[in-house]
């Protein structure tokens, strides 16, 4: 991310007072405050209420498996509760029209857009170069947002980034990001085609064909692992 873009993002966060503002949901039970519900009943039941705050989690699966729909549902729920959310979208793949129809309130969402994947300068199959730079910028933007605080849910969409490119990032990248949000009210979620990283207290929601999902904690697949995600919630 160019220095001017970094400066602008930091200025924007300060202007909106998101660099020190904590999300407001104090009237909820203590346990509920530390979870971000996905809004999908069967999945939230398996998650014991939702995605844990203060941790790095992931939603993974092939294209059209419903991975993005799970996240959009969580974003919609968070904004409806009055929380600020953020999406780091390095390849500009997000569909705001569909998200708005699903209930996402864009007045409460910071959308950080990278260069469109359709651009001649970006190739989803390239091994290095522009795509790697897009990923590096996305990680820098993610770090700035997490450092700012005040977000209930922060998502980075790496679903269309080749795993070979993602694996070039040092694993310490994810460790450092988790340390930023550890103990905070922010849940950070990675979207990927395959598992990328999660903190010890985070979860992996693994989507499969037929809108089936399974939840993985502490490197173990939970018993009764498959949860049916309704088609309406996994349409994108």
For each predicted feature, which ranges?
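Phosphate-binding/switch region of NTP-binding enzymes
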Residues: 170-174, 178-236
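Conserved inter-motif catalytic segment of the P-loop NTP-binding fold
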Residues: 62, 73, 81-164
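Hydrophobic/aromatic beta-strand patches that form the interior of the parallel beta-sheet core
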Residues: 57-59, 86-88, 110-112, 189, ...
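Amphipathic alpha-helical interface segments used for dimerization/assembly
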Residues: 75, 142, 185-188
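Detector for small/aliphatic-rich hydrophobic stretches
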Residues: 1-87, 101-104, 121-131, 135, ...
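Short, solvent-exposed loop/turn segments at secondary-structure junctions
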Residues: 161-166, 197-199
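Amphipathic alpha-helical transducer elements in NTP-driven molecular machines
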Residues: 37-40, 53, 68, 132-140, ...
């Amino acid at each position: 991310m160019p220095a001017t873009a970094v400066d602008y993002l930091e200025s924007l966060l300060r202007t909106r007072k998101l660099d020190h503002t904590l999300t407001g949901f104090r009237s909820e039970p203590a346990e509920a405050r530390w979870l971000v519900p996905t809004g999908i009943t069967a999945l939230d039941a398996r998650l014991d209420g939702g995605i844990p705050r203060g941790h790095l989690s992931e939603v993974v699966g092939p294209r059209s498996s419903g991975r993005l729909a799970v996240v959009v549902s969580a974003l919609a729920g968070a904004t409806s509760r009055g929380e600020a959310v953020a999406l780091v979208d390095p390849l500009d793949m997000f569909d705001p029209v569909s998200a708005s129809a699903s209930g996402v309130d864009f007045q409460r969402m910071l959308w950080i857009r990278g260069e469109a994947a359709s651009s001649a300068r970006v190739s989803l199959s390239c091994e290095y170069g522009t795509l790697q730079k897009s990923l590096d910028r996305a990680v820098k933007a993610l770090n700035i947002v997490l450092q700012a605080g005040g977000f209930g849910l922060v998502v980075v969409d790496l679903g269309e980034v080749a795993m070979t490119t993602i694996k070039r990032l040092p694993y310490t990248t994810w460790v450092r990001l988790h340390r930023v949000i550890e103990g905070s009210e922010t849940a950070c979620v990675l979207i990927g085609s395959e598992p990328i990283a999660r903190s010890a207290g985070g979860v992996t929601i693994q989507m499969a064909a037929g809108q089936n999902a399974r939840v993985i904690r502490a490197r173990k697949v939970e018993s009764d692992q498959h949860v049916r995600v309704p088609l309406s919630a996994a349409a994108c």
